[in-house]
Every structure is written in structure tokens, then in C-alpha cells.
């Protein structure tokens, strides 16, 4: 049952519609998966899936799963990065940004990574996706999930929104703010959300959301687009939040939230939830529990100015070329400390420990890289030899020695921000030979020219 505060507030706002819109909370929480375009198409997935599902109304790549005992984390497709287990309405926000390959995209509150994986699929390996999480333990889980999903162009940060906005002003073409919220849409799925819910929490989350939105506005380039979303129904965090933002930021305009997609879902916003401030609620979107999801709110905001021209496919802008050249030169000169080597097994164990520590509330920011050492020059030479044999398409990619192994970096400036991963960790040297890392195959497996194909069909 919802809290007394929640029920009183919503009955006052909705009147007789309360019973209709909140008819579903007594039922079992909806379950779903979102398919990655980096792996397959929704049509191919639907044909091959060995569990009952139906297309989700909230996202063309998402499906509702109708099997109560289904364990998505145990399915081979999960481990292969084919899908991300995601509550159906949670998949709705990312497509609304209209991300195109080559863009610079920021997911400001990204953990555990479901929406970031959708944004990465839209980028198709071009441009850069900056996925940030403030809580260190959750940032480790975010990094692990993006590796599993085969994302090759992500920069994973463990930072505050304010530091990102200061370091990268007007840098991003698209920004997603899936804000930390009071979680009223999670009452069925997460009992702890119901236990912690109170009026003070709503006010606290509204204040935090406003601060994050201001940082997002500073990081967004002229002509860029920002999507704000929550999984709550509180007016202060939804329509009221957006209306107040527009008062503070006259350089922004509210756009039709569905303007970048060719489908519709949910309901329009509510006039009596704007806090008395002007807002065209027909341009924002709500998903109520009775509509097939747990609950979501979304708005799209456009910053005044001319959008950045995207580079042609396969090309970098002059400044991106400088960033990559600087990273490559740093690797050649061995500016990093001599790298401790690790085999693939020890790397996987380190990732497992990081996930375990995250669950227990602690954090490991570095890998246990195992025994032995190799110089940066030795590591790079071993990678080049391995790449020529198995991944010739990657031979010309800039490579640097970092964190105990070889990294294929993303075109991204040196900012002083706390970076957990910026590119693909392809492997390391052990006893004189190159040992590939799992991330190499999740990100670039299709480029391998000397391997045996496997299929789950």
C-alpha cells in the first residue's frame, strides 16, 4: 500500500481518476528487456528468444517479458550483451534524445547503465558517450555493464555534475538527466522505496534534481537537447521541476518530448502539477502504473543556438584528432608507470570483486592486476603483434598503456575528472605474450578475422 502522504496528495490532485491510474500497484511489477542494436535487431531477437515476450509500447527495442520465473541475468543473451534487463517504462527516456552517430552524449546519472546502453546503441560506436555516476560503488557496476554490452566509445566517470559542467562547458550535443528521485514509480518493484518514502524525501530530491539540471544546462552545447526524466509522480520533481527550470534558464525552450520518435505512449502532463508556473503540459509525458509500466515522467528541452556540425563517418574533428594524438604519444613515451600485467582470469575476478564490493557498499577503484611487470613499450608492441594476427582493423587505432594493460582510448580531452574507463581495455602482457581481455571481444568481436564463429540459434 502507498504511504499516507502519497495517497492524500495524489487523491487531491487526481480526484476520481486516482483509482483508475493507480489500479495496478497491487499487481506484480512489470518486467522487460531492451535489445542492443550493437548486437541484433528487435525483429531478429523476437524470432530467436526462447521465452515469452511482447513488444513494449515505450521503446521499439524493448519487450515485456511474460514469464514470472524468468531470470534474465542467467540467460546467455544477457552475458553476450544482447539485451539489458530493464523495467518497461524505464526504456522510454533514452530514445527521446534523438541521438545520432558522431554526437557527444552525456548520461549524467547513469548507473546501473540501462539508459547508457541504449544511448551507446544509437551512437553505433561513433562519437563519445560519457556515462557518469556519483556513487563510487555504483560507478563500478556501470563500468562493468557497459563492458558487457560491448560499448567501445564510452568514458565512465565517477564525478559530481558540478565538476563535469565546470570541466566541459557547452561540450555535449545531448544530455540525459535521469534524476535521482523519490522513486514513487518503484513501489511495486522495490519495497525499500516504499519504506523510505516521505514528504521530506520528495523535497530533498526536488532540490537535488534542480541542481543537477543546472549543471546539465551548463554542459550542453548551443542547439543541443536535454531530456529530463524521473521514475516518480511527485509534482515538485516532474512538471514543477521543468517549469521552474525554464524560469531560471530563458535560453531553453520546452519541445515536444515525442518529437524525435515516430510513436506515442503514456499520457500528457498534468496542469495542476506545475506549482503555478507556466508550462505547456501537452509537450511532456507521463507513464502511469495502469499503462503497462512502473511509472515515468519525461520532458525534452532545447538550448538556443546552432547545433554543432557532426564529422562524416570515419572522420574526426581537428580537436578530436589532437586528443587522440596526445593519448597515443603518451602511450609511446611511456608516461604511465610500468604496467603490472594480468591474465584474463585475474581481470574477471577483479571485476567480480568490484561488483561484490559494490553490493556490500564498498569500492575498488583499481584492478588487482596480478603478478609480473611489462614496460609500456613492451605492452604496446605485444598488442600490435596480436592485433595484426586477429584484429587487423584495429592496428591503426591509437593505443595507450593504462591501468595494468593496453587501452584503445576514446577521443576525449584531458580534464582532470575521475575517469574509471575511457575506451576499451583490450588486454595485457603476461610472461612475454599478449593476453586479450573480455572487453576486446564484447566491443570488437565482429572484427576478429582468425576465430571460430559460435551461435546460440
Task: Describe every region a protein language model picked out.
Residues 151, 162, 173-174, 179, ...:
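S-adenosyl-L-methionine-dependent methyltransferase catalytic core, i.e., the SAM/SAH-binding region
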Residues 1-171, 203-208, 255-281, 285-287, ...:
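Glycine-rich nucleotide cofactor-binding entry segment
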Residues 245:
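Conserved catalytic/ligand-binding micro-motifs in nucleotide and anionic cofactor chemistry
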Residues 103-104, 128, 174, 223-226, ...:
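Short glycine-centered segments of the SAM/dcSAM-binding site in methyltransferase folds
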Residues 137, 174-215, 227, 231-239, ...:
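Mobile active-site "lid"/loop adjacent to the S-adenosyl-L-methionine
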Residues 124, 220-222:
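Helix-to-beta-strand junctions that scaffold the AdoMet/dcAdoMet cofactor pocket
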Residues 1-13, 17-48, 294-297, 304-457:
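Polybasic, low-complexity RNA-engagement segments
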Residues 174, 248, 276, 283-316:
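Core SAM-dependent methyltransferase catalytic element
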Amino acid at each position: 500500500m502507498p504511504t499516507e502522504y502519497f495517497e492524500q496528495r495524489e487523491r487531491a490532485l487526481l480526484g476520481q481518476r486516482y483509482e483508475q491510474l493507480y489500479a495496478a500497484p497491487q499487481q506484480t511489477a512489470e518486467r522487460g528487456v531492451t535489445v542492443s542494436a550493437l548486437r541484433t535487431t528487435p525483429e531478429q531477437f523476437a524470432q530467436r528468444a526462447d521465452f515469452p515476450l511482447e513488444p513494449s509500447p515505450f521503446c521499439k527495442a524493448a519487450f515485456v517479458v511474460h514469464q514470472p520465473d524468468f531470470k534474465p541475468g542467467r540467460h546467455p543473451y544477457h552475458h553476450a550483451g544482447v539485451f539489458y534487463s530493464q523495467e518497461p517504462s524505464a526504456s522510454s527516456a533514452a530514445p527521446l534524445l534523438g541521438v545520432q552517430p558522431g554526437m557527444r552524449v552525456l548520461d549524467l546519472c547513469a548507473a546501473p547503465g540501462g539508459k547508457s546502453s541504449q544511448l551507446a546503441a544509437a551512437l553505433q560506436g561513433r562519437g563519445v558517450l560519457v556515462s557518469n555516476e556519483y556513487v563510487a560503488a555504483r560507478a563500478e557496476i556501470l563500468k562493468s555493464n557497459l563492458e558487457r554490452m560491448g560499448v567501445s566509445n564510452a568514458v565512465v566517470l565517477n564525478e559530481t555534475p558540478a565538476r563535469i559542467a565546470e570541466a566541459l562547458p557547452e561540450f555535449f550535443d545531448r544530455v540525459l538527466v535521469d534524476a535521482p528521485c523519490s522513486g514513487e514509480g518503484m513501489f511495486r518493484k522495490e519495497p525499500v522505496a516504499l519504506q523510505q518514502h516521505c514528504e521530506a524525501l520528495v523535497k530533498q530530491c526536488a532540490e537535488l534534481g534542480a541542481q543537477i539540471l543546472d549543471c546539465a544546462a551548463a554542459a550542453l552545447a548551443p542547439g543541443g537537447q536535454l531530456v529530463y526524466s524521473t521514475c516518480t509522480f511527485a509534482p515538485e520533481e516532474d512538471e514543477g521541476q521543468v517549469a521552474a527550470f525554464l524560469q531560471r534558464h530563458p535560453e531553453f525552450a520546452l519541445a515536444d518530448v515525442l518529437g524525435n520518435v515516430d510513436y506515442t505512449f503514456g499520457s500528457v502532463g498534468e496542469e495542476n502539477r506545475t506549482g503555478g508556473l507556466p508550462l505547456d503540459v501537452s509537450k511532456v509525458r507521463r507513464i502511469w502504473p495502469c499503462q503497462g509500466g512502473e511509472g515515468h515522467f519525461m520532458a525534452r528541452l532545447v538550448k538556443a543556438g546552432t547545433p554543432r556540425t557532426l564529422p562524416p563517418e570515419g572522420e574526426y574533428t581537428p580537436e578530436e584528432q589532437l586528443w587522440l594524438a596526445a593519448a597515443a604519444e603518451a602511450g609511446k613515451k611511456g608516461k604511465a608507470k610500468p604496467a603490472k600485467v594480468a591474465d584474463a582470469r585475474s581481470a574477471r575476478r577483479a571485476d567480480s570483486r568490484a561488483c561484490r564490493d559494490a553490493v556490500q557498499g564498498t569500492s575498488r577503484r583499481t584492478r588487482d592486476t596480478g603478478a609480473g611487470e611489462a614496460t609500456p613499450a613492451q605492452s604496446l608492441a605485444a598488442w600490435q603483434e596480436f592485433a595484426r594476427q586477429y584484429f587487423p582493423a584495429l592496428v591503426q587505432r591509437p593505443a595507450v598503456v593504462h591501468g595494468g594493460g593496453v587501452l584503445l582510448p576514446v577521443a576525449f580531452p584531458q580534464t582532470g575528472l575521475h575517469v574509471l574507463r575511457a575506451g576499451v581495455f583490450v588486454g595485457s602482457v603476461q610472461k612475454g605474450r599478449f593476453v586479450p581481455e573480455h572487453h576486446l571481444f564484447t566491443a570488437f568481436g565482429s572484427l576478429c578475422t582468425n576465430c571460430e564463429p559460435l551461435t546460440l540459434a
